[in-house]
Amino acid sequence: MENTLVKSLYRDTEKYADQTVQVSGWIRNLRDSKAFGFIELNDGSFFKSVQIVFDTELENFKEIAKLPLSSSVKVEGKVIATPGAKQPFEIKAEKIDIEGLSDSDYPLQKKRHTFEYLRTIAHLRPRTNAFSATFRVRSIAAFAIHQFFQERGFVHVHTPIITGSDTEGAGEMFRVTTQDLNNLPKGEDGKVDESKDFFGKETNLTVSGQLNAEAYALAFRDVYTFGPTFRAENSNTTRHAAEFWMVEPEIAFAELGDVMNLTEDMLKYAMKYVLEHAPEEMEFFNSFVDKTVLERMNNVINSDFGRITYTEAIKVLQESGADFKYPVEWGIDLQTEHERYLSEEIFKRPVFVTDYPKDIKAFYMRLNEDGKTVAATDLLVPGIGELIGGSQREERMDVLVDRIKELGMNEEDYWWYLELRKYGGTKHAGFGLGFERFLMYITGMANIRDVIPFPRTPGSSEF
């Protein structure tokens, strides 16, 4: 008999009513008495489990009744509609085969476990309701983002993981080497001789695919990357991880306003898609994790995003009368408390802050006519503050070279990036979305470690 997915049973219960089906899955819960028992069976295809009813008519009733949690079984039985019960149907088992036994020391017994504890068993935590919901939503949201760009004719570019350039100019990068760390070759100046290394120069794990994506935008017009990025930032916070995923579109013949429109369209599309394709999971998050999740998402979907310049935002914050921990003055990098005040108290919806001081932004952002600010934007959203950062890129060769020198960066490292301006350069723009930060926003999960399957953070690289 062909296996039927639990998802199919839930989505089309009438079709399967009174039919004999075969389902396979893992035991989430088991209750038994002398004459009959109940199994909550989850097959991974759906958030909810299916209830299996079995009785002494089974040849192996006693064996089944003693099965430990997480044992895997194959069940054949009739689908019985139960409109008055918690679940719309159950399966009356006619045959249960044991696929794999679980040891009695299985750590996920029927009790509440803290997220901190579940991080220590990251290989087992997707079997819990919270993480089953989280990682299915992660999958659905990733698909939605790909579909958004594909429907609009964007080319998906696979940018390199190993790179010789630092997009942010921040220097917080993981080094890649095959050298013997106990016997590093050194030059006459006593410094490590990078020419003897695998690539013949210093290389690192990428912090962003943006620079490479720009090269492809100047050939394909509209492109995007969606891949892992790495920061050797020793920040032990709920919002930082050493390995995370970034969505980075680049569009040619575009200015800052175009990329803000793209940002707004993509966010609304992805959120709508998740609400439509993961209703059970989103209801779970709204009930048990963060009771404002659905309201927050619908606020984003149904709002026209606000727009305000950095200079105007500073003035609004200074005149607000609010007691901020960090003083507000022109030139500061806005702190989370400032960002949340703007989005939650002033606009009460997502808002783009634009035209930041050049001294707090990256070298590649286009210098404005005032010479003090750049064509950059951060999208601030209620609940967390900054969600997305974007900018119009500097297309003028001389201005870009001046910025690189001004920041003390090595011009030679960016020779190919500068050449993009020599050969038919044009105005172009893009943004970066930290995918995990987006997931935290739509699920209410408060720690980035809980939206990545196997988190990599300072002092932790288990699994």
Curated annotation (Swiss-Prot):
Presence of the UniProt keyword Chloroplast in the record: no
Q: Which SUPFAM superfamilies match?
A: Class II aaRS and biotin synthetases, Nucleic acid-binding proteins
MF terms from GO for this chain are: asparagine-tRNA ligase activity; ATP binding; catalytic activity, acting on a protein; nucleic acid binding; transferase activity
* EC number, as in UniProt: 6.1.1.22
Which cysteine pairs are joined by S-S bonds?
Answer: none
**What is any Pfam family matched here?**
tRNA-synt_2
Q: Which UniProt keywords apply?
A: Aminoacyl-tRNA synthetase, ATP-binding, Cytoplasm, Ligase, Nucleotide-binding, Protein biosynthesis
For this entry, list what GO says about its biological process: asparaginyl-tRNA aminoacylation
Q: Which InterPro entries match?
A: Aa-tRNA-synt_II, aa-tRNA-synth_II, aa-tRNA-synth_II/BPL/LPL, Asn-tRNA-ligase, Asp/Asn-tRNA-synth_IIb, NA-bd_OB-fold, NA-bd_OB_tRNA
Q: Name one GO cellular component term.
A: cytoplasm
**Which NCBIfam families is this protein grouped with?**
asnS, PRK03932.1
Q: What is this protein called?
A: Asparagine--tRNA ligase
Q: Tell me the organism.
A: Bacillus cereus (strain ATCC 14579 / DSM 31 / CCUG 7414 / JCM 2152 / NBRC 15305 / NCIMB 9373 / NCTC 2599 / NRRL B-3711)
Q: Which lineage do the record's taxonomy fields give for this organism? A: Bacteria, Bacillati, Bacillota, Bacilli, Bacillales
Whichever gene encodes this chain, its name is asnS
